[in-house]
């Protein structure tokens, strides 16, 4: 289960999305709709610290969500675009984590020494410009963000212009990482926490600035 997946929420309609101003205006006017909106993470959002949001409506809460006029209007506009292709209140694929999501950009600059990755909590949606592991073991962060993994990326990854295109099939699944003991995993996890602590010290900097 420790495999990166593409769970891209792709749609031609912008009506399911909110920029930061739209989000703040929406929850100010309708505080109750906050439970139907999630932070939306893509490559640029993750790397540059851009806040974008999306409606997250499961079948179980659909009727309740549509009692709100703002949501009802956005769903109606999306329905006009989608016609009868798929539900107008959901993305192409909706997968949820129990605790955390480990996210990596699908495209990363050739000038980076490490792949910039990040943990997000379970109340996060992702778009098609990233791939993710849902509920990973913490040591996976250390492996994927290591220098040796970056060497592998440079060797086997596809390219978008000159930048690296990270994929589960070509890069992650083929990475020749040996079986390790629980003690070794715990040591890697200690180092992961050191990295995360160092990031926290530079919390004003984006991942793009740090990497």
What feature does the model see in each segment?
Residues 171-211:
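Extended amphipathic alpha-helical segments enriched in small hydrophobics
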Residues 1-187:
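Polybasic, glycine- and aromatic-enriched phosphate-binding surface used to engage nucleic acids
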């Amino acid at each position: 289960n420790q495999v990166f997946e593409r769970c891209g929420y792709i749609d031609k309609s912008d009506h399911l999305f909110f920029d930061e101003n739209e989000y703040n205006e929406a929850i100010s006017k309708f505080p109750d709709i906050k439970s139907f909106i999630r932070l939306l993470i893509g490559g640029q959002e993750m790397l540059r610290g851009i806040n974008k949001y999306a409606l997250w409506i499961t079948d179980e809460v659909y009727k309740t969500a549509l009692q709100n006029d703002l949501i009802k209007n956005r769903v109606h506009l999306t329905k006009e675009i989608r016609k009868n292709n798929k539900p107008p209140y959901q993305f192409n694929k909706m997968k949820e984590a129990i605790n955390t999501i480990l996210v990596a950009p699908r495209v990363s600059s050739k000038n980076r020494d490490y792949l910039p990755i990040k943990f997000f909590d379970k109340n996060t949606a992702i778009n098609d410009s990233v791939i993710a592991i849902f509920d990973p073991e913490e040591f996976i962060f250390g492996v994927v963000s290591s220098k040796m993994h970056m060497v592998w990326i440079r060797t086997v990854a596809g390219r978008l212009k000159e930048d690296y295109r990270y994929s589960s099939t070509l890069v992650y699944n083929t990475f020749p990482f040996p079986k390790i003991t629980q003690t070794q995993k715990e040591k890697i996890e200690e180092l992961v926490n050191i990295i995360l602590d160092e990031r926290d010290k530079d919390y004003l900097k984006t991942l793009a600035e740090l990497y």
